[in-house]
A protein has these predicted regions:
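Gly/Pro-enriched, hydrophobic low-complexity segments
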Residues: 2-6, 19-30, 119-124, 132, ...
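Sequence-pattern detector for short linear motifs
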Residues: 6-7, 23, 42, 57
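Core hydrophobic alpha-helical transmembrane segments of single-pass membrane proteins
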Residues: 7-16
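Ser/Thr/Pro/Gly-rich low-complexity linker/stalk segments immediately outside membranes or between
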Residues: 23-51
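Hydrophobic transmembrane signal anchors and adjacent membrane-proximal interface regions, especially
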Residues: 24, 36, 50-55, 71, ...
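Intrinsic-disorder-associated interaction segments
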Residues: 48-58, 171, 175
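Short secondary-structure boundary micro-motifs
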Residues: 51-52, 62-63, 83-84, 115, ...
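N-terminal mature ectodomain segment of secretory-pathway/periplasmic proteins
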Residues: 56-151
Length: 294
């Protein structure tokens, strides 16, 4: 009986901490929007006037990126770095995760189940944690190998959208990944398509992982009072591969002149695509992983 009680307590404790990608922290962040200098006075020209970019242009780029992924992206690996502000306004630490992902566009018929493997690298409190989820695996449950001498003795199975798994998270594991990021951006952008208070800039020459990318900045001049409201959003696009590599959004400063507070940041570094991931990459029995054998 004592053994069962101890195991039960361990599972509850593990569940509470398992999906907390970001550890609560009262420390601030030095993150700030990229300062981009844009000329307001274009030189005189006999040619046609160049229209400033707008949300429609951003939506077109995002739609093109989604189409490119549907055609060319079967799977990928990356060093995923995320940072989020929780529901009470506390900005968590940056969390670094090694990610392996299979998109829904793989296979001969361009249709495959979505699968994800995560291994946490930092912060130290979660280093070594592993998570596997697949829409066709384990009855939709999330397999978790927690860190620690006691908590790491047993694989924990969680509902990905349940209260324990969502503790401290903005999105469930099923919403992680390049494809979902683009789809979410399109969904948000459509809400601002006809918003006159939104200003857009698109700048070449932004370096991300030693790759020349485009930096898109979307600025709101007044709050929208929507659930996903922001003052500034930044999107980094790799134009060669038509992939969105990074997204950050900032809230509204408390007073004029203050830096806007970071709300969320997601970046995919060292991205490798179409490397041939198999079902073994999303199997708790994979000997390269640390999942317990029971």
């Amino acid at each position: 009986m004592l053994k069962k009680i101890l195991v039960g307590i361990a599972l509850i404790v593990a569940g509470v901490v398992v999906w907390r990608f970001t550890q609560s922290s009262t420390a601030g962040s030095s993150a700030a929007p990229v300062n981009v200098s844009v000329r307001k006075d274009a030189p005189e020209s006999d040619g046609p006037a160049v229209q400033a970019p707008n949300i429609g242009d951003v939506l077109k780029m995002a739609s093109d990126a989604l189409l490119a992924m549907e055609t060319n992206l079967d799977d990928y690996t990356a060093r995923f770095v995320k940072q989020e502000r929780d529901s009470v306004g506390v900005l968590g630490e940056p969390t670094e995760i090694s990610i392996r992902a299979q998109t829904r566009f793989g296979g001969d018929e361009n249709q495959s189940p979505r699968r994800i493997y995560l291994r946490f690298q930092s912060p130290a409190a979660v280093q070594g944690r592993e998570v596997i989820w697949g829409e066709d695996l384990y009855d939709g449950k999330m397999a978790v190998h927690e860190v620690g001498m006691i908590l790491g003795l047993k694989t924990i199975w969680l509902d990905p959208t349940g209260m324990i798994a969502m503790q401290g998270q903005r999105y469930p594991i099923s919403e992680i990944g390049l494809v979902k990021l683009v789809e979410k951006l399109i969904e948000r952008g459509e809400q601002d398509r006809d918003n006159p208070s939104v200003e857009v800039s698109i700048n070449d020459g932004h370096v991300f992982d030693e790759v020349d990318c485009q930096l898109i900045q979307v600025r709101r001049h007044e709050p929208s009072d929507s659930e996903d409201d922001f003052s500034v959003a930044e999107i980094v696009v790799d134009p060669q591969r038509q992939l969105i590599l990074s997204y950050r959004s900032f809230g509204w400063p408390e007073k004029p002149g203050d830096q806007p507070p970071l709300l969320e940041s997601y970046a995919y570094h060292d991205l490798k695509t179409n490397i041939g991931l198999t079902k073994a990459d999303f199997d708790t029995k994979n000997t390269n992983y640390g999942f317990p054998r029971f």
